[in-house]
Amino acid sequence: MPRYKLTVEYDGTPYVGWQRQENGHAVQGAIEQAFKKFCGEDLTLSAAGRTDAGVHATAQVAHVDLAKDWGAGKVRDAVNAHLVMADERISILNVEKTTDTFDARFSARARHYLYRIHNRRAPLAVDYQRAWWVQKQLDADAMHEAAQRLLGEHDFTTFRATQCQAKSPVKTLDRLDVTRNGDMVEMRVSARSFLHNQVRSFAGSLMEVGVGRWTADDLQAALEARDRKACGQVAPPYGLYLVGVDYAFPF
């Protein structure tokens, strides 16, 4: 069976997350339904990141096996046509044939996320449900400086959800940058893999630094506490975007 690698963009607002669920409309289920209308197959997509409800993606990666050897362009255009007809907020940006050794989740070498904070007094209109609205002025430089304390390998128990199913809380953080562009404060974070709610926990805790309630030492103390109760607030899902997944090629 030929295997296809998909690059997917979606607005996470109307979905219960990536993963198909019995109750609620999921991104995975919507794409699988579009495939069924295209080729008549009941199939299962595997993705690099199982994003939560409300989280967006500009470059999610998934793979799927099809019974027939379709052209990659045909797959992209046909599935997109069915997604449009179903009024889904999902776009298949690219499809390419790959080998059966490629796995969107387990072959990934790095995942890249963006968290957007719209920092202004006026409420959001265009960016509503696309960024976290924070009214109090944020010191992005202080946030960035504090964020560097989190780089490297650590036990990130403080920054993971209590229901996280990962076997170990130890992860290696490769990048955590905070920058400001006008009213927009952006946090970019990269690692091979993440714990449940880890990025949103970083964003919420760094916001505490940005408004002056925490110092960089406070953030480090929270990390070293290895206690979920030491975390700042968990930032809302709609500011979070999966923006890239890296792989080692060829397969």
Curated annotation (Swiss-Prot):
One of its GO terms (molecular function) is tRNA pseudouridine(38-40) synthase activity. It comes from the Bacteria. It catalyses: uridine(38/39/40) in tRNA = pseudouridine(38/39/40) in tRNA. Substrate binds at residue 113. Its EC number is 5.4.99.12. One of its GO terms (biological process) is tRNA pseudouridine synthesis. InterPro entries: PsdUridine_synth_cat_dom_sf, PsdUridine_synth_TruA, PsdUridine_synth_TruA_a/b_dom, PsdUridine_synth_TruA_C, TruA/RsuA/RluB/E/F_N. The active site is at residue 52. The keyword Plastid does not apply. Pfam families: PseudoU_synth_1. The keyword Secreted does not apply. Keywords: Isomerase, tRNA processing. Belongs to the tRNA pseudouridine synthase TruA family. Formation of pseudouridine at positions 38, 39 and 40 in the anticodon stem and loop of transfer RNAs. Homodimer. This is tRNA pseudouridine synthase A. It comes from Brucella canis (strain ATCC 23365 / NCTC 10854 / RM-666). The gene is truA.
